[in-house]
């Protein structure tokens, strides 16, 4: 069964093709093999945690490790961080455009809290500690994070810097 392409795998393949055309096939194979192994090792995770593992965490680890075959560790880290930052900028622009719709901005706090509790809740491996709710304020500390935990488990906690 073919995996759904994530933004990380797409960006990794683009980097391999543009910067390392002679090694692109080898890099893509290394990425695919590592990602398959990581997915197999984490197959028992909850459905909620799988959402994060498949879309972001494990492709990030596989890309980071594969890039280290052709560049220094710090450069590979910056490349993978660049992928994430580019997605964040794009998402920010999309949200900012939506918030120009009259009245929509009033709905955002409630929707944000509800979706964050759902997607980043205990079932997904997070341990949120809500510090303040109400009066238009929601403060939360994440006491446990599967992004950090998984990256640390695989020897690359720096991916969460």
Regions found by a protein language model. Give the residues of each.
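Amphipathic interaction/junction segments at domain boundaries or subunit interfaces
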Residues: 66-154, 159
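N-terminal leader/assembly segments
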Residues: 1-90
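A structural signal for well-ordered alpha-helical scaffolds and beta->alpha junctions
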Residues: 60, 160-161
